[in-house]
Curated annotation (Swiss-Prot):
Protein family per UniProt: Belongs to the 4Fe4S bacterial-type ferredoxin family. RnfC subfamily.
List of residues binding [4Fe-4S] cluster 2: 387, 416, 419, 422
Membrane topology listed for this record: Peripheral membrane protein
UniProt keyword list: 4Fe-4S, Cell inner membrane, Cell membrane, Electron transport, Iron, Iron-sulfur, Membrane, Metal-binding, Repeat, Translocase, Transport
Gene transcribed to yield this protein: rsxC
Protein name: Ion-translocating oxidoreductase complex subunit C
C-alpha cells in the first residue's frame, strides 16, 4: 500500500490559480520538419543577447572570421557571442536590435563569404571524465543561454545552483499560441535533448529530473517516451494545456506543488529549470564542441505562404527569414517577435535574430482582428481572476498610470510575468501589460539611479577616509622627522656635541646658580673696583686732559677773537679814518691762544687750582652772540661788513696756537702736559697751511681757493682725537 501511495504521489501534478485557454494555432507550423535557411549575405550580431553586460570585443574591422569563432570574451555574466558563419568583419557599430523600441546596441557586422567554414571543433564525448567546473566553464564560453525567452546565462545559472538543487525541471510546455519551435525540436532531436539533460543532471546531481510537457504535443510526447523507455533517472510529466503553464513559477507549482516566494527564485526552494532548447545547445557545446550559432525559429501566420520551423543563424535579418517563408505583406502589415500574448511588434524588419528569438508571427488583418479602442476600467475583476501570479492587475494599473511607484512595488509588480492573460480577458481593451512593462522599467531606472548615487557616496566617503589617513600618516611622518633626525645625520650631530663638550671642558668653570638663590658676583665686582682705583691713581699722577682746561676750548677762543675784531672795527669807525685791512681772525685766534697758554703756565707755577672747564656748547653760544653784536654795530655805523669769522677756522688756529705754546713750555723745561707724537704732526701740518695762506695774503696776490671750513674743522677734530688716543696709549705704556 505504501509503494502504491508513493507511486501515486510520484506522478501527481498540481494546478495554479488563474490562467486562460486561448485558441491554439500550432497546427500551422508543427506539421513540417525542421529545415535550413540559405545564408544571408550580411549578418548583424549584437554583443548583448542575454541578461547581463556585453562581452569584451576580441575582433576588429577587417578581420576574417570562421563559424564558431568568438567575437567577444565572457567574464562573469558577460556571455560571449560567436560568428554565425565565415566571412569578414566590415563594421563594429550600433544597430537596431530585437526590442519593442528597436534600441540600437553595439553589434559586429559580418559579410558572409558563402563558404561557411567552421573553426576546429573539439568535443568531449566522455563528458563524465571532466570536472563540474570544467563543464560549466565550457558551457559558458560557448555562449549557451536560456533559449526559452529569458536569456539568462546557463553557466552562471548552473554555478549559482550549487548543492542546493534537489529537482531539475526541463520546460517543454511551450504554452504560447502559434509557437511550435520546442515541439518540432523534440520531434526531430529527442535523443540529443535527452543527452543534454543528462549532462545537466551530471553537473547538478539532483535527486529527481522532471520533464513537463503539455498534452497538446502528442508526437513530441511519443518521441520522448521512446527515448526514455529504458531510463529511470528522468521522469516525463504530461500536464493539461493551460496558458501560461510554461511560466517558470507556474510549471514549478504544477510539478512539485511548491510556490516560489515573492521576490525569490526557484533555487530558493531547491528547483532549477531549463528549456529543452537549452538542453540541446548544452549537448552541442559539450559533446560536439560547437558554440551556439543557430537556433530553431517558428515562422507562422497567414501572411506567410510556407510556415514552419527553421534553423536560423544568429544575426540573420528578420526580412531574410520571412522572404524565405514566402512573406506577403499587406498595407498595414505587422510582424510580431514572439507569441501573440507575450511578444512585441517590430518597428521594422532589419533587426537580427538573437538567442531569445523563438517565433516570427506575420498575421493577416482578419487573423488579428480590427484594433479595439481602449476604454475606462469597469472594475469587473476579470483580470484578477485570470492572473496566474495572484496579483491585482486593476490596482497595479492605477498605480502605474498614476506614477505611484512605491505602491506598485508594495503590490508586487515585480512578480508579474507579463503573460498577457489580464489584457486578454479585459472587456475594456486596456493594454495592461504595456502599462506594467513601462512601470517596471521606470522602477528599475529609479533603483539604478539610487544604486549609482549610493556607489558615488561610498566612493566619496572612501576617498575622504583615504585622504584623512594620508593626512594622518603625513603629519606623523613630519612629526617623527622633526623629533628624530635621520640616521645619516646622527654622526654629524654626535661630532658637534663632542666638540661643544670639549670646548666647555677647556673653558673656565661656569658659575652655577642654585634655584631660588641670587648669583655670586663678588669676584667680578672686586675686579671692577680694583680697575677703577688703578685708573684714578694714574689720572692723579699724570693730569692730561688738556681739553678739560678752560683755555683749551676753541669755541671760547673764537668768541674772544670775534670780540677783539669787533672792538678794533669800532675804534676805526670812531676815528673816522678809512678802514684798514680787516683784522685776520686767524691771527687773533693765535694771539689769544698764546695769551691763554702763558696764563696757564703762570697758574701752574703758582700752584693754583685748575679753573672749571668751560662748557663748549655755552662758549659756542657766546661766540655766536658776540658775532651778532659786532655785525649789528657795523651795520649801525654804515660801514661795509667785515668778512664773517668762521668759527671752525678760528678753532683750528687756536689749536695751532696751543700746540706752539706747549712746545715752548717743553723747551723751557716744564713737564709735558701730554705726549706730542701724533698731535705734533697734525699741529705742524695745520701751522704750515696757515703760514702759506698768510704769505699769500700779505703778498697781495690773487686770493687762493677758499679753504673749506668743514674740512678744516674735520681735520682739527681728527687731530685732537689722535692726540688724545696717543696720550692715553702713552699713559698705559708708562704704567
Amino acid at each position: 500500500m505504501l509503494k502504491l501511495f508513493s507511486a501515486f504521489r510520484k506522478d501527481k501534478i498540481w494546478d495554479f490559480d488563474g490562467g486562460i485557454h486561448p485558441p491554439e494555432m500550432k497546427t500551422q507550423s508543427n506539421g513540417t520538419p525542421l529545415r535550413q535557411v540559405p545564408l544571408a549575405p550580411r549578418f548583424v550580431i549584437p554583443l548583448k543577447q542575454h541578461i547581463g553586460a556585453e562581452g569584451e570585443l576580441c575582433v576588429s574591422v577587417g578581420d576574417r572570421v570562421l563559424r564558431g569563432q568568438a567575437l567577444t570574451r565572457g567574464r562573469g555574466r558577460m556571455l560571449p557571442v560567436h560568428a554565425p558563419t565565415s566571412g569578414t568583419v566590415i563594421a563594429i557599430a550600433p544597430h537596431s536590435t530585437a526590442h519593442p523600441s528597436a534600441l540600437a546596441e553595439l553589434s559586429v557586422i559580418i559579410d558572409a563569404d558563402g563558404e561557411d567554414r567552421w573553426i576546429e571543433r573539439e568535443g568531449w564525448s566522455d563528458y563524465r571524465a571532466h570536472s563540474r567546473e570544467a563543464l560549466i566553464e565550457r558551457i559558458h564560453q560557448y555562449g549557451v543561454a536560456g533559449l526559452g525567452g529569458a536569456g539568462f546565462p546557463t553557466g552562471v545559472k548552473l554555478q549559482g545552483g550549487g548543492d542546493k538543487i534537489t529537482t531539475l525541471i526541463i520546460n517543454a510546455a511551450e504554452c504560447e499560441p502559434y509557437i511550435t519551435a520546442d515541439d518540432r525540436l523534440m520531434q526531430d532531436c529527442a535523443a540529443q535533448i535527452v543527452e543534454g539533460i543528462r549532462i545537466l543532471a551530471h553537473i547538478l546531481q539532483p535527486r529527481e529530473v522532471l520533464i513537463g510537457i503539455e498534452d497538446n504535443k502528442p508526437q513530441a510526447i511519443s518521441m520522448l517516451r521512446a527515448v526514455l523507455a529504458d531510463a529511470h533517472d528522468i521522469s516525463l510529466r504530461v500536464i493539461p494545456t493551460k496558458y501560461p503553464s510554461g511560466g517558470a513559477k507556474q510549471l514549478t507549482q504544477i510539478l512539485t506543488g511548491k510556490q516560489v516566494p515573492h521576490g525569490g527564485r526557484s533555487s530558493d526552494i531547491g528547483v532549477l529549470m531549463q528549456n529543452v532548447g537549452t538542453a540541446y545547445a548544452v549537448k552541442r557545446a559539450v559533446v560536439d564542441g560547437e558554440p551556439i550559432t543557430e537556433r530553431v525559429v517558428t515562422l507562422t501566420g497567414e501572411a506567410v505562404s510556407r510556415p514552419g520551423n527553421v534553423w536560423a543563424r544568429l544575426g540573420t535579418p528578420v526580412r531574410h527569414l520571412l522572404n524565405d517563408a514566402g512573406f506577403c505583406p499587406s498595407a498595414d502589415q505587422m510582424v510580431i517577435m514572439g507569441g501573440p500574448l507575450m511578444g512585441f511588434t517590430l518597428p521594422w524588419l532589419d533587426v537580427p535574430v538573437v538567442k531569445i528569438t523563438n517565433c516570427l508571427l506575420a498575421p493577416s488583418v482578419t487573423e488579428m482582428g480590427a484594433p479595439q479602442e481602449e476604454k475606462s476600467c469597469i472594475r469587473c475583476s476579470a483580470c484578477a481572476d485570470a492572473c496566474p501570479a495572484d496579483l491585482l492587475p486593476q490596482q497595479l494599473y492605477w498605480f502605474s498610470k498614476g506614477q505611484q511607484h512605491d505602491k506598485a512595488t508594495a503590490h508586487h509588480i515585480a512578480d508579474c510575468i507579463e503573460c498577457g492573460a489580464c489584457a486578454w480577458v479585459c472587456p475594456s481593451n486596456i493594454p495592461l501589460v504595456q502599462y506594467f512593462r513601462q512601470e517596471k522599467a521606470e522602477i528599475n531606472a529609479i533603483r539604478l539611479e539610487e544604486k549609482r548615487a549610493a556607489e558615488a557616496k561610498a566612493r566619496f566617503e572612501a576617498r575622504q577616509a583615504r585622504l584623512e589617513r594620508e593626512k594622518a600618516v603625513r603629519l606623523a611622518r613630519h612629526k617623527s622627522a622633526a623629533v628624530q633626525p635621520a640616521a645619516k645625520d646622527q654622526d654629524a650631530i654626535a661630532a658637534a656635541l663632542a666638540r661643544v663638550k670639549e670646548k666647555q671642558a677647556q673653558a673656565t668653570q661656569p658659575v652655577v646658580i642654585q634655584a631660588g638663590s641670587l648669583p655670586d658676583n663678588s669676584a667680578v665686582i672686586a675686579a671692577r673696583e680694583a680697575r677703577k682705583a688703578q685708573a684714578r691713581a694714574k689720572q692723579a699722577a699724570h693730569p692730561v686732559a688738556d681739553s678739560a682746561l678752560p683755555g683749551d676750548d676753541p669755541r671760547k677762543a673764537a668768541v674772544e677773537a670775534a670780540i677783539a675784531r669787533a672792538k678794533a672795527r669800532k675804534q676805526e669807525q670812531q676815528a673816522g679814518s678809512e678802514p684798514a685791512e680787516p683784522v685776520d681772525p686767524r691771527k687773533a685766534a693765535v694771539e689769544a691762544a698764546i695769551a691763554r697758554a702763558k696764563a696757564r703756565k703762570q697758574e701752574q707755577q703758582a700752584g693754583s687750582e685748575p679753573v672749571e672747564a668751560v662748557d663748549p656748547r655755552k662758549a659756542a653760544v657766546e661766540a655766536a652772540i658776540a658775532r651778532a653784536k659786532a655785525r649789528k654795530q657795523e651795520q649801525q655805523a654804515g660801514g661795509e661788513p667785515a668778512e664773517a669769522v668762521d668759527p671752525r677756522k678760528a678753532a683750528v688756529e687756536a689749536a695751532i696756537a696751543r700746540a706752539k705754546a706747549r712746545k715752548q713750555e717743553q723747551q723751557a723745561g716744564s713737564e709735558p702736559a701730554e705726549p706730542a707724537a701724533p698731535r705734533k704732526a697734525a699741529v705742524e701740518a695745520a701751522i704750515a697751511r696757515a703760514k702759506a695762506r698768510k704769505q699769500e695774503q700779505q703778498a697781495g696776490s690773487e686770493p687762493a681757493e677758499a679753504v673749506d671750513p668743514r674740512k678744516a674743522a674735520v681735520a682739527a677734530a681728527i687731530a685732537r682725537v689722535q692726540a688724545k688716543k696717543a696720550a692715553q696709549q702713552q699713559v698705559v705704556n708708562e704704567d
